[in-house]
């Protein structure tokens, strides 16, 4: 009888810990939403909240026009664990902070360890935006042997034209596979569809109409109103259209 009670208490403790962790992860997701990170779309897997799906859209610099899929893997005890989250891109990317063998992103220069309550996932994504916007600045002050891909760093510093050409190859390759069949049945996996006028046309028109009305609504927003809307991908391109 005592053994049964101890087992029940242990099960209850595990359940409570799991529920608390789920709430903390949900809070992280809500913070990402509130930050309105332009060019980064991410969502936890329905099957496992420790695994997230994501897409990065480059908006400026050498990586502008890029569309890179990535996975975000959280440690088992996140966010209480000091271990860092893992970002793994689904394609080869030439960048000083991306491992050429595993496609994993090195975030240790910004986050030596994960500090619960101080470090948040939206900050990680902000860092991702920054290092792709200005890769040269991202390696400034870092010793070459501490960089995940020193060959990429050396090429960036000594032959920027060649570096840019190889990055363009990465971008082209990623776009060629953007419509590939999804590798998982998880309904939260981010899927791209080719533009279909009968399906997506009405949505695009609503977006255009909303943008035309933005000027008229500016005064209302200043007085406390908010504007919301839909996002989509422009026909023939990979730029997200959005009303925020």
UniProtKB/Swiss-Prot annotation:
UBC core domain residues are: 20-176
* Database matches in InterPro entries: UBQ-conjugat_E2_core, UBQ-conjugating_enzyme/RWD
Q: Which residues form the signal peptide?
A: none
Q: Which SMART domains match?
A: UBCc
Pfam families named in the record: UQ_con
Q: Which family does it belong to?
A: Belongs to the ubiquitin-conjugating enzyme family. FTS subfamily.
The protein here is known as: Protein crossbronx
Name the encoding gene, please.
cbx
């Amino acid at each position: 009888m005592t053994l049964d009670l101890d087992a029940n208490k242990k099960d209850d403790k595990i359940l409570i810990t799991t529920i608390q962790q789920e709430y903390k992860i949900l809070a992280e997701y809500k913070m990402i939403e509130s930050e309105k990170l332009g060019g980064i779309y991410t969502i936890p897997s329905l099957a496992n909240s420790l695994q997230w799906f994501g897409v990065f859209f480059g908006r400026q610099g050498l990586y502008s026009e890029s569309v890179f899929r990535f996975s975000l893997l959280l440690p088992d005890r996140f966010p209480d664990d000091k271990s860092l989250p893992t970002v793994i891109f689904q394609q080869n990317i030439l960048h000083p902070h991306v491992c050429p063998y595993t496609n994993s992103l090195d975030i240790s220069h910004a986050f030596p360890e994960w500090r619960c309550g101080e470090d948040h996932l939206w900050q990680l994504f902000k860092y991702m935006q920054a290092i792709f916007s200005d890769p040269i600045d991202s390696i400034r002050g870092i010793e070459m042997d501490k960089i995940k891909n020193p060959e990429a760093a050396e090429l960036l510093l000594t032959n920027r034209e060649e570096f840019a050409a190889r990055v363009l190859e990465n971008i082209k390759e990623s776009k060629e596979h953007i419509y590939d069949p999804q590798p998982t049945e998880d309904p939260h996996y981010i899927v791209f569809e080719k533009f279909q006028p009968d399906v997506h046309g009405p949505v695009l028109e609503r977006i255009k109409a909303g943008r035309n009305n933005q000027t008229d609504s500016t005064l209302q927003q200043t007085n406390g109103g908010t504007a919301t809307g839909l996002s989509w991908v422009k026909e023939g391109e990979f730029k997200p259209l959005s009303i925020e």
